[in-house]
C-alpha cells in the first residue's frame, strides 16, 4: 500500500475517500471507531457508523473508540492525503486486541458469518448510494 500511496493506479487519480475492510466477516464481529480513522477521516467514520445505526447494525458498528492500528489506511492518509478509514473487528477479550483466530491456523472459512457480511455490505451500499445522491 505504501507504493500505491505514492503512485496512483491512474495518473492524476484522486479518490474522495477510502474504506479498508479488515477482518469484517467473523461471527459476532465488533467494529469500534479505530484511532487513525478518527484522526484522519472522522466525517467518513461518522457517515459509515450513522448508516449502520439507521440500518439496525449498531451491534456491529459500535461507538467505542479503539487505539490506532497501523495498517494500509494509515499510509493512504499520511502519505497520499486521501481520508481513509479502517473497519476492523477488534476484541477487548484478547491480549492483541484482535480476534483469537487472527493470524492463526484456526482462521478458516468456517469463521465467516453471513449476517456479519450482510451488515457490512448493506451499510457500505447505503453509504455509496447516499454519496452518489449528493454528487
Regions found by a protein language model. Give the residues of each.
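A conserved short beta-strand
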Residues: 13-19
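Surface-exposed acidic, glycine-flexible loop patches that form ligand/cofactor-binding
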Residues: 7-12
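Active-site-adjacent substrate-binding region
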Residues: 17, 24-135
Amino acid at each position: 500500500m505504501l507504493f500505491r500511496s505514492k503512485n496512483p493506479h491512474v495518473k492524476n487519480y484522486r479518490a474522495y475517500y477510502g474504506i479498508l475492510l479488515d477482518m469484517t466477516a467473523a461471527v459476532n464481529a465488533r467494529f469500534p471507531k479505530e484511532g487513525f480513522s478518527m484522526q484522519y477521516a472522522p466525517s467518513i467514520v461518522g457517515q459509515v457508523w450513522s448508516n449502520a445505526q439507521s440500518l439496525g447494525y449498531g451491534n456491529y458498528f459500535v461507538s467505542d473508540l479503539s487505539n490506532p492500528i497501523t495498517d494500509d489506511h494509515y499510509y493512504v492518509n499520511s502519505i497520499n492525503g486521501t481520508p481513509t478509514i479502517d473497519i476492523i473487528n477488534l476484541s477487548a477479550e484478547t491480549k492483541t486486541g484482535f480476534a483469537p483466530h487472527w493470524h492463526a491456523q484456526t482462521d478458516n472459512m468456517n469463521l465467516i458469518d453471513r449476517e456479519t457480511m450482510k451488515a457490512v455490505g448493506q451499510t457500505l451500499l447505503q453509504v455509496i448510494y447516499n454519496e452518489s445522491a449528493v454528487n
